[in-house]
């Protein structure tokens, strides 16, 4: 049976040789094994680790550059937005001032137009009143003249006799001939 043990574990024949080998159990490793493992890792893994670290470094640097570029872009956009905001505020203030000025101008124009229209209406009213007064006066004159003429006719008809009519006709004929002779002598 001891041969079976030697076949299964060849190190058991050599007691000193049984202690040489890699012990991968971290708790049981000794300093030499750690040195060998670390040395092997440093020798063979140096390039791999260096490449990984360089790639990681490039990724980080690119990320930083991108972040700085985005920061600069954002800063520039913020500055542009602030400039645009200032322009908009200035324009809004300018529009507000122009609006106030325009309102004052239009207010004065409306007051002037209302005053002018009021004066024009007053003049039109006065003209209409004057024309109505003239029309009424003319109508009163006609009425008075008509009444006076009717009264005169009534008086004349009452006083006018045939003798008086003959005397008046003779008087008018004499007056006409006298005027006619004066105008022919000239």
Swiss-Prot record:
Keywords: ATP synthesis, CF(0), Chloroplast, Hydrogen ion transport, Ion transport, Membrane, Plastid, Thylakoid, Transmembrane, Transmembrane helix, Transport. GO terms for cellular component: chloroplast thylakoid membrane; proton-transporting ATP synthase complex. One of its GO terms (molecular function) is proton-transporting ATP synthase activity, rotational mechanism. Its main location: plastid. It is a single-pass membrane protein. The chain crosses the membrane at residues 26-44. It is found in: Plastid, Chloroplast thylakoid membrane. In plastids the F-type ATPase is also known as CF(1)CF(0). F(1)F(0) ATP synthase produces ATP from ADP in the presence of a proton or sodium gradient. F-type ATPases consist of two structural domains, F(1) containing the extramembraneous catalytic core and F(0) containing the membrane proton channel, linked together by a central stalk and a peripheral stalk. During catalysis, ATP synthesis in the catalytic domain of F(1) is coupled via a rotary mechanism of the central stalk subunits to proton translocation. Component of the F(0) channel, it forms part of the peripheral stalk, linking F(1) to F(0). Belongs to the ATPase B chain family. F-type ATPases have 2 components, F(1) - the catalytic core - and F(0) - the membrane proton channel. F(1) has five subunits: alpha(3), beta(3), gamma(1), delta(1), epsilon(1). F(0) has four main subunits: a(1), b(1), b'(1) and c(10-14). The alpha and beta chains form an alternating ring which encloses part of the gamma chain. F(1) is attached to F(0) by a central stalk formed by the gamma and epsilon chains, while a peripheral stalk is formed by the delta, b and b' chains. This is ATP synthase subunit b, chloroplastic. It comes from Chara vulgaris (Common stonewort). The gene is atpF.
């Amino acid at each position: 049976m001891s041969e079976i043990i030697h076949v299964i574990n060849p190190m058991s024949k050599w007691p000193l040789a049984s202690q040489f080998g890699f012990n991968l159990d971290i708790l049981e490793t000794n300093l030499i094994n750690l040195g060998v493992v670390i040395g092997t890792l440093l020798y063979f893994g140096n390039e791999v680790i260096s490449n990984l670290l360089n790639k990681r470094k490039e990724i980080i640097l690119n990320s930083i550059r991108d972040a700085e570029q985005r920061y600069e872009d954002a800063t520039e956009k913020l500055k542009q937005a602030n400039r645009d905001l200032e322009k908009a505020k200035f324009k809004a203030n300018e529009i507000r001032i122009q609006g106030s000025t325009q309102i004052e101008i239009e207010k004065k124009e409306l007051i002037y137009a209302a005053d002018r229209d009021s004066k024009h209406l007053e003049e039109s009213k006065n003209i209409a009143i004057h024309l109505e007064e003239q029309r009424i006066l003319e109508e009163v004159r006609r009425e008075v003249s008509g009444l006076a003429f009717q009264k005169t006719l009534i008086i004349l008809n009452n006083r006018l006799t045939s003798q008086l009519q003959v005397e008046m006709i003779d008087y008018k004929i004499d007056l006409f001939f006298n005027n006619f002779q004066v105008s022919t002598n000239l």
